[in-house]
Design a protein with these regions (language model features):
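Active-site-proximal loop/short-helix segments
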Residues: 81-85
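A C-terminal junction/extension of Radical SAM enzymes
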Residues: 86-167
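Radical SAM/AdoMet-radical enzyme domain recognition
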Residues: 1-80
């Protein structure tokens, strides 16, 4: 059994601000079409939302879009932290630590009031599992890594979905 990861960063204006194709056009419509197809065929999917400098100031808009419009049951919020190869400084797309923290707090406050047990957000579920002494499925909270195999669209295979880059191929 597989869980398909769909990369989408929120509603159209937030997603298309950072996710464009080779022609510079936003990919929102294609992603939504793919989601419709997955739902039609009852394929389980997980939202992979990169939190960046653009959508990082809109936690409730992003979360409510996934919950209410996409009807996502599983969501991951992954911070964008990119460094310029020459200078080593963070790129303008990177989310600041403060911005990412406020984003997670905004989502958590909404989630804990309304959606615990119906919407699964990886960081929050992992924290709760740890608190209860239960097993969790995220390697950054585990003694070892490699329990979540990833197959990318181009066929590349990784042993962890948190280290999907050439150094870990």
């Amino acid at each position: 059994r597989f869980l398909v990861g769909i990369s989408i960063d929120g509603p159209r204006e937030l997603h298309d601000a950072c996710r464009t194709d080779a022609a510079g056009k936003g990919t929102f419509d294609r992603v939504m079409k793919s989601l419709t197809l997955l739902k039609k065929h009852k394929v389980n999917f997980n939202i992979l939302c990169t939190v960046n400098a653009v959508n990082g100031d809109h936690p409730l808009e992003v979360y409510r879009f996934f919950r209410d419009e996409v009807k996502a049951q599983f969501i991951q919020f992954i911070p964008v932290v990119e460094r310029d190869h020459q200078s080593g400084t963070l790129t303008p797309l990177s989310v600041s630590p403060e911005q990412y923290g406020k984003f997670l707090i905004g989502v958590f406050d909404e989630w804990v009031k309304h959606d615990v047990g119906t919407t699964y957000i990886q960081h929050f579920d992992t924290a709760l599992a740890n608190w209860y002494g239960e097993q969790h499925g995220i390697c950054v909270f585990s003694p070892t890594c490699g329990s979540a195999m990833v197959i990318e669209h181009n066929g590349d295979i990784y042993s962890c979905d948190h280290f999907v880059d050439r150094d870990h191929l």
